[in-house]
């Protein structure tokens, strides 16, 4: 997937995506790695949003839940580490 823009909320926004990812131990950089090099994209069964699966440079397997704003822009909602066999 190639997106030209990834929208991040302010770091100190308690309801923002930066903080939500951080609560799961995932950094913005890791989310961007997965979105730029996703191994699989599917739909979440719980939210219906698109999810991207991929590995970080550190070897973590992450699931990133996101919203497509347009063809070039995404808004990551949350992200967390998942076992490789888990599906949305």
Mark where each language-model region is:
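Ribonuclease/tRNase effector modules and their secretory precursors
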Residues: 1-88
């Amino acid at each position: 997937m190639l997106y030209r823009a990834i929208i991040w909320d302010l770091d100190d926004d308690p309801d923002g995506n930066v903080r939500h990812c951080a609560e799961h131990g995932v950094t913005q950089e890791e989310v961007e790695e997965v979105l730029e090099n996703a191994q699989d994209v599917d739909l979440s069964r719980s939210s219906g949003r698109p999810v991207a699966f991929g590995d970080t440079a550190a070897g973590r397997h992450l699931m990133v839940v996101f919203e497509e704003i347009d063809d070039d822009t995404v808004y990551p909602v949350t992200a967390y580490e998942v076992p490789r066999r888990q599906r949305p």
